[in-house]
From Swiss-Prot:
The gene is xylA. One of its GO terms (biological process) is D-xylose metabolic process. This is Xylose isomerase. It comes from Paraburkholderia xenovorans (strain LB400). NCBIfam families: PRK05474.1, xylose_isom_A. PANTHER family: PTHR48408, XYLOSE ISOMERASE (PTHR48408:SF1). Its EC number is 5.3.1.5.
């Protein structure tokens, strides 16, 4: 059965095309800085928003009537969901996908049933991957939707909940390994608190650290060669989450000896919820040595929650890719669309429109970021701005040759009277805009 029979394969037709079911900028074989756009982007489509979400919100019921969600038997629905997903991936021409365990497989009424269902669906997904050549960017476990996780999973006050969550992660990590996934993601959706009045903060942080060590140990045990990634988010659904932002995650990893084992998966909308730019979080992750992968989406500046809209700002994406390309590009990570169509976008075509537009925006951003790297004007100015630190005096300060006292004595002896030099922010912004809008 075809779920998108009337939709053709999406192909590149160039900027002049008026075909809404074609790429205008994403020519996957086009080379930029020595790699194809497909290699730079490593695009993935997520299972949950695209094939699971029924179009509900807190004020209304689901608006979507997806044909793959109609079968009476839960396992048959799971197989139909996989059929529709891989047909979609194939027509869109995207090389990767991502999932939560309960996106792809029915949870069942017991842990035993959950495990059996998941094993069977993993085999089914393996066959779909073999038939299509589509690969798994990352897998994860849903440790936030079921009522048992209302007070958290690893941070739950109930050790039985912790154990249930550990079982899910064990199976999800095993499935990711079985399917050749490049990463495994840990999103602490309810690893946080709603009020400190009933929360033992230190205990919960220790529990979370123990859980992460168990995950790392299991990954080593099964020979998982991919990256383990935490996805930071400041709040929602809890008031405060322990993986607030990239810097917070890094501090937690350092505290618990995990900084060499786990990196971050950065979501654009989570960055803005934390009061940061997408650019900031990516740059911070690279500065701290924990950059892993990206969830591509955007929020609404007028809304204080995670709207998971498709990314449509080439300006924002260019700055993100400027950081990524400067550091050599993705290794195991990629660009996963943690994005969903709006509740009113009920036609099957809308799923394609959202992804096509976003993929075109990513392609443009890679090309514009490459211009910034090739003309080198931003980095050239930075090198000039910090040149004093590369000279003898600056190097001696950083190498520890001076104490606070001897540096003060030297400053007095030199009669230092430094004058401020312009930061040229406006010029830097003009250089970025010239690259984006003029391509040079």
């Amino acid at each position: 059965m075809s779920y998108f029979e009337h939709i053709p394969e999406i192909r590149y037709e160039g900027p002049q095309s008026d075909n809404p079911l074609a790429y205008r900028h994403y020519d996957k074989s086009k080379k930029v800085l020595g790699k194809t756009l497909e290699e730079h982007l490593r695009i993935a489509v997520c299972y949950w928003h695209t094939f699971v979400w029924p179009g509900v919100d807190i004020f209304g019921q689901g608006t979507f009537r997806r044909p793959w969600q109609q079968a009476g038997d839960a396992m048959e629905r799971a197989r139909q969901k996989a059929d529709s997903a891989f047909e979609f991936f194939s027509k869109l021409g995207t090389p990767y996908y991502t999932f939560h365990d309960t996106d792809v497989s029915p949870e069942g009424s017991s842990l035993k049933e959950y495990s059996e269902n998941f094993l069977r669906i993993t085999d089914y997904l393996a066959r779909k991957q073999e038939d299509t050549g589509i690969k798994l960017l990352w897998g994860t476990a849903n440790l936030f939707s079921h009522p048992r996780y209302a007070a958290g999973a690893a941070t739950s006050p109930d050790p039985e909940v912790f154990a249930f969550a550990a079982t899910q992660v064990r199976h999800a990590l095993d499935a990711t390994q079985r399917l050749g996934g490049d990463n495994y993601v840990l999103w602490g959706g309810r690893e946080g608190y709603d009020t400190l009045l009933n929360t033992d903060l230190m205990r919960e942080r220790d529990q979370l650290a123990r859980f992460l060590h168990m995950v790392v140990d299991h990954a080593h045990k099964i020979g998982f060669k991919g990256s383990l990634l935490i996805e930071p988010k400041p709040q929602e659904p809890t008031k405060h989450q322990y993986d607030y932002d990239v810097a917070t995650v890094h501090g937690f990893l350092l505290q618990h000896g995990l900084e060499k084992e786990i990196r971050v998966n950065i979501e654009a909308n989570h960055a803005t919820l934390a009061g940061h730019s997408f650019h900031h979080e990516i740059a911070t992750a690279y500065a701290l040595g924990i950059f892993g992968s990206v969830d591509a989406n955007r929020g609404d500046p007028q809304n204080g929650w995670d709207t998971d809209q498709f990314p449509n700002s080439v300006e924002e994406l260019t700055l993100a890719f400027y950081e990524i390309l400067k550091h050599g590009g993705f290794t195991t990570g990629g660009m996963n669309f943690d994005s969903k169509v709006r509740r009113q976008s009920v036609d099957p075509e809308d799923l394609f429109y959202g992804h096509i537009g976003a993929i075109d925006n990513l392609a443009l951003a890679v090309e514009r970021a490459a211009v910034l790297i090739e003309n080198d004007r931003l980095d050239q100015f930075k090198r000039q701005r910090y040149a004093g630190w590369d000279a003898d005096f600056g190097r001696k300060i950083l190498s520890g040759d001076y104490s606070l006292s001897t540096l003060a004595t030297d400053a007095l002896a030199r009669g230092l009277n430094p004058q401020h030099a312009s930061g040229h922010q406006e010029l830097m912004e003009n250089i970025v805009n010239q690259a984006i809008y003029s391509g040079r």
